[in-house]
């Protein structure tokens, strides 16, 4: 059934339901990935089989084969020697679940996408954006194995730089989907000063930098060190000789536990301050929806800062660390919504969907209007 003139608000209803599901699955994937890291389960599967690897060991012989593979890597020999098969199964299931969820996301994204393309439900501008998101998702699978491979030969854990890259790419994909969903909403343009647009974009950019810095802290397990606040290593600003002792100097930004955690703290202060200034400006100019968005973002960052402080004080226990990671997703979502809200015009949204307007080949009974 062809819809000759679907209302703007319902034009992409089916596509938006699909993308919302994908975004939710990615959020779950990020949290499962965090739990996999915190339980030190990420190296339990030492091979990459994108298709046949979807099946776990089904017999005792297969379990022993998988366990024997794990016994060959440094993590087992140096950290987990003497681990029992039952203990191995625990860490195996975390990593297997993480990989399985990645496969599920790929299927949930690709099959409906192809169906919508076949039905002519997606205009040319959206096709380009959604194909790029799919390509990033495929790349993410390869990046995940690239990360795991870094811990299979010499290290007892994965490279923190590769871990940060893996997480950052997942968050970029998530943010792109949230941005796309917002553009499809076809809401009226928000009237606000240009400086609010600038600070909203700065907040989004700084949020990504902070998320990358947080991933470095996680990868180095730096949150289990320097467990005081506001002091770090006995001072508000640690001694330069300890912050920059590695050569060349830039290696400290990625490898020095003290520098990495200090940078994460300083970025948090900068992000919170910028969010406060953005909120005050939005409230003073009575920017409507933008003011509400600014308040929500500031409140989320305040909660996130508190979670970060407690995570450090208690040396990064799993529950607090996961809560901190979950709240980071909330902050990113709100930052994306605020930036999109202040940068898009109504004309932008209308033009992007023009290719499908008037020929949205989606059965109305499948996605009825709310």
Curated annotation (Swiss-Prot):
Enzyme class: oxidoreductase
Record's catalysed reaction(s): Fe(II)-heme o + 2 A + H2O = Fe(II)-heme a + 2 AH2
Gene Ontology biological process terms, A to Z: heme A biosynthetic process
Names of required cofactors: heme b
UniProt key word Transferase: no
UniProt keyword terms in alphabetical order: Cell membrane, Heme biosynthesis, Iron, Membrane, Metal-binding, Oxidoreductase, Transmembrane, Transmembrane helix
UniProt KW Transcription regulation keyword: no
Transmembrane segments: 15-35, 104-124, 129-149, 161-181, 200-220, 261-280, 293-313, 317-337
Pfam families: COX15-CtaA
E.C. code: 1.17.99.9
Residues binding heme, per UniProt: 264, 324
GO cellular component, as recorded: plasma membrane
Pathway: Porphyrin-containing compound metabolism; heme A biosynthesis; heme A from heme O: step 1/1
Entry function: Catalyzes the conversion of heme O to heme A by two successive hydroxylations of the methyl group at C8. The first hydroxylation forms heme I, the second hydroxylation results in an unstable dihydroxymethyl group, which spontaneously dehydrates, resulting in the formyl group of heme A.
Family to which this protein belongs: Belongs to the COX15/CtaA family. Type 2 subfamily.
PANTHER family: CYTOCHROME C OXIDASE ASSEMBLY PROTEIN COX15 (PTHR23289), CYTOCHROME C OXIDASE ASSEMBLY PROTEIN COX15 HOMOLOG (PTHR23289:SF2)
Subunit details: Interacts with CtaB.
HAMAP family (UniProt xref): HemeA_synth_type2 (MF_01665)
Name of the molecule in the record: Heme A synthase
Species name: Rhodopseudomonas palustris (strain TIE-1)
Gene: ctaA
């Amino acid at each position: 059934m062809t819809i000759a003139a679907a209302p703007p608000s319902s034009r992409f209803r089916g596509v938006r339901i699909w993308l919302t599901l994908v975004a939710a699955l990615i959020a779950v994937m990020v949290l499962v990935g965090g739990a996999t890291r915190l339980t030190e389960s990420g190296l339990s599967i030492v091979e990459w089989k994108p298709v046949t690897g979807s099946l776990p060991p089904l017999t005792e012989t297969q379990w022993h084969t998988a366990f024997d593979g794990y016994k060959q890597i440094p993590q087992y020999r140096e950290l987990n020697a003497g681990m029992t098969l039952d203990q191995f199964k625990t860490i195996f299931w975390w990593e297997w679940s993480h990989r399985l969820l990645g496969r599920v996301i790929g299927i949930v994204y690709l099959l409906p996408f192809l169906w919508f393309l076949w039905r002519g439900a997606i205009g040319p501008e959206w096709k380009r954006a959604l194909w790029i998101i799919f390509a990033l998702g495929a790349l993410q699978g390869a990046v995940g194995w690239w990360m795991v491979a870094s811990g299979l030969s010499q290290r007892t854990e994965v490279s923190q730089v590769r871990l940060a890259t893996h997480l950052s790419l997942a968050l970029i994909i998530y943010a792109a989907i949230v941005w796309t969903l917002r553009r499809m909403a076809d809401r009226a343009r928000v009237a606000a000063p240009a400086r609010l647009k600038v600070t909203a974009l700065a907040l989004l950019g700084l949020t990504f930098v902070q998320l990358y810095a947080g991933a470095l802290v996680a990868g180095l397990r730096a949150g289990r060190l320097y467990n005081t606040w506001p002091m770090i290593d006995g001072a508000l600003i640690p001694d330069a000789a300890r912050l920059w002792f590695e050569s060349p100097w830039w290696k400290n930004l990625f490898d020095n536990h003290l520098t990495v955690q200090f940078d994460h703290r300083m970025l948090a202060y900068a992000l919170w301050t910028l969010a406060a200034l953005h909120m005050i400006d939005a409230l003073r100019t009575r920017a409507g929806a933008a003011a509400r968005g600014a308040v929500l973002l500031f409140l989320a960052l305040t909660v996130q800062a508190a979670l970060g402080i407690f995570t450090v004080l208690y040396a990064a226990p799993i529950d607090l660390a996961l809560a901190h990671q979950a709240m980071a997703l909330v902050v990113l979502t709100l930052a994306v919504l605020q930036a999109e809200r202040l940068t898009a015009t109504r004309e932008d949204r209308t033009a992007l969907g023009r290719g499908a307007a008037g020929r949205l080949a989606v059965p109305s009974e499948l996605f009825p209007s709310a």
